[in-house]
Amino acid sequence: AAQQKQEEETLKAKAEAEAAKTVVLDSASLFFQAAQGSEQFTTLENDKVKLLISNKGGRVCQATLKDYNDQQKEPLVLFDGEDASLNLGFDGKNENILSNQMYFQAVDVTDSTVTMRLNAGTGNAHLDFIYKLLPESYMLDFTVQAVGMQNFFSPSTKSISIDWKQRVRQMEKGYTFEQRYTSLTYKPSNDSFDHLSETKDDMKSMPEALD
């Protein structure tokens, strides 16, 4: 039990350190211009869900379910504003990118698709976050694509870091019941589904890739 508690504290400390990272860009940075801007939103929707994508960080910042109502009989908002955050980190040769500090441009916009583009300061090099909301579905495809960035990334870079946080709203009138049965499910690429504890604080380190 003592060892498990120590592991949990270590994981928590690492998570807090990652969240506290700040990349300071000077005027010579490839992404100096992308670090300046004002927040704007793009809407994706189908018959089941409506999503707001923010150009700040290129992330989904609001999700509303059309077929369900909350306790006030309004469309059910799963998360909004600061309820959820997503930060992708990319290691470069001379500088690093944290997506939550950058302003993306929305291109190739339709009712159900958008590409959030982070332009580098040279040529046509850019980083794309591609969103596609599937028809008649709650599923949102998300693809990260780098174009002309081969000279930016370190040759040793094989992965990106993901810092994802979500504050789960109370949806049911019965708080105790909802808390007891709400869980976070995940799937390692070469294994079956697993989940964190529903009834207590739980943290796990995942050295393998997740689907």
Language model: regions and residue ranges:
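Subset of Sec-pathway N-terminal targeting signals
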Residues: 1-15, 121
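Intrinsically disordered, low-complexity regulatory regions of eukaryotic regulatory proteins
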Residues: 5-6, 14, 24, 200, ...
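Soluble non-transmembrane domains of integral membrane proteins
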Residues: 34-211
